[in-house]
From Swiss-Prot:
Organelle transit peptide residues: 1-50
Domain of life according to the entry: Eukaryota
Top-level class of the enzyme under EC nomenclature: oxidoreductase
Protein's name according to its UniProt entry: 2-oxoisovalerate dehydrogenase subunit beta, mitochondrial
Organism of this sequence: Homo sapiens
One GO BP annotation of this record: response to nutrient
Family matches, as InterPro entries: THDP-binding, Transketo_C/PFOR_II, Transketolase-like_Pyr-bd, Transketolase_C
Gene3D superfamilies per the UniProt record, alphabetical: 3.40.50.920, 3.40.50.970
Catalytic reaction(s) noted: N(6)-[(R)-lipoyl]-L-lysyl-[protein] + 3-methyl-2-oxobutanoate + H(+) = N(6)-[(R)-S(8)-2-methylpropanoyldihydrolipoyl]-L-lysyl-[protein] + CO2
Gene name per UniProt: BCKDHB
Length: 392
């Protein structure tokens, strides 16, 4: 009871500080979010809340795919969809509000360009959207379905797990729906709270027959999405919605592909392997810089990119070299995909490990609203875990 009372008292002080409008450092706030600064305007506060926990780091400008154009992530998704519709006359895009451009504007202009028979709205029924997509794909056409938020993909869980993933196997490959791609905005955004912030990739990692992909940047998003659309298996493509406008870089105008199930070593190192995907990649890149500056520690940074089937070889090769592994994701710790990576690595690389594998993830609670800054695995939490590994 004493612990509960202390926690309640801390929360009341936090609310009081907010009501007075002069946030200050509160006891027990921790390094990650100890300082809460006064906001000049509501808009300033919202902007700070959205981008405070990471700094987007663009990739080098690609030169092997022809002319490029600066795009943010939602524009790169639009470009990929535009390329697919232009290349494949059977391709169709559908979902809630898709014909109007979607809530994040990823399909803006496509209905006007390709017609209402190829880009169209659906009722608000996720199970129906995916079931409809399976039917389209079974005919041999290319189906690109949008679930408006990853948090609302669960009504379609049965259609994805028991129908789409198994269709080829239960028919002996007489029929398949491999030309189905399901897009969905994913992850925290700064103000999404319970129903617009979740990272459900681990739910689908236990489902053989589908592929799950999460990009970290506009360049990656376009190349990986095109690969998903062209892949012969049903794919779920989760798009980090906080990066829709926070991330911008040079992206090729013409179509190109980035291979699925191949992790990318973004930065080579010798002391610790850092693994993440989506937005969290930018967090661990900052952690790698902090470790180099403050501790003299060399970190190898890896973007997993494809959750299932994941690239075991690249991760294990790195851990054999460094002897230490830290995995970070926004989803809750228990049952998160970091657990699968950790289990596999300790089986394959046990004698090479110099310290226990560390998982820095979200808490085992529903995603909070005003306490999101405390919930997310920011660079300070990752840095503290890395320091403990080095000192083990």
């Amino acid at each position: 009871m004493a612990v509960v009372a202390a926690a309640a008292g801390w929360l009341l002080r936090l609310r009081a500080a907010g009501a007075e409008g002069h946030w200050r450092r509160l006891p027990g706030a921790g390094l990650a979010r100890g300082f809460l600064h006064p906001a000049a305007t509501v808009e300033d506060a919202a902007q700070r809340r959205q981008v405070a926990h990471f700094t987007f780091q663009p990739d080098p400008e690609p030169r092997e795919y022809g002319q490029t154009q600066k795009m943010n992530l939602f524009q790169s998704v639009t470009s990929a969809l535009d390329n697919s519709l232009a290349k494949d006359p059977t391709a169709v895009i559908f979902g809630e509000d898709v014909a109007f451009g979607g809530v994040f504007r990823c399909t803006v202009g496509l209905r006007d360009k390709y017609g209402k028979d190829r880009v169209f709205n659906t009722p608000l029924c996720e199970q129906g959207i995916v079931g409809f997509g399976i039917g389209i794909a079974v005919t041999g056409a290319t189906a690109i379905a949008e679930i408006q938020f990853a948090d609302y993909i669960f009504p379609a869980f049965d259609q994805i797990v028991n129908e789409a993933a198994k269709y080829r196997y239960r028919s002996g490959d007489l029929f398949n729906c491999g030309s189905l791609t399901i897009r969905s905005p994913w992850g925290c955004v700064g103000h999404g709270a319970l129903y617009h912030s979740q990272s459900p990739e681990a739910f689908f990692a236990h489902c053989p027959g589908i592929k799950v992909v999460i990009p970290r940047s506009p360049f990656q998003a376009k190349g990986l999405l095109l690969s998903c659309i062209e892949d012969k298996n049903p794919c779920i493509f989760f798009e980090p919605k906080i990066l829709y406008r926070a991330a911008a870089e040079e992206v090729p105008i013409e179509p190109y592909n980035i291979p699925l199930s191949q992790a990318e070593v973004i930065q080579e190192g010798s002391d610790v392997t850092l693994v993440a995907w989506g937005t969290q990649v930018h967090v661990i890149r900052e952690v790698a810089s902090m470790a180099k500056e403050k501790l003299g520690v060399s970190c190898e940074v890896i973007d997993l990119r494809t959750i299932i089937p994941w690239d075991v070889d690249t991760i294990c090769k790195s851990v054999i070299k460094t002897g230490r592994l830290l995995i970070s994701h926004e989803a809750p710790l228990t049952g998160g995909f970091a657990s699968e990576i950790s289990s596999t690595v300790q089986e394959e690389c046990f004698l090479n490990l110099e310290a226990p594998i560390s998982r820095v993830c979200g808490y085992d609670t529903p995603f909070p609203h005003i306490f999101e800054p405390f919930y997310i695995p920011d660079k300070w939490k990752c840095y503290d875990a890395l320091r403990k590994m080095i000192n083990y």
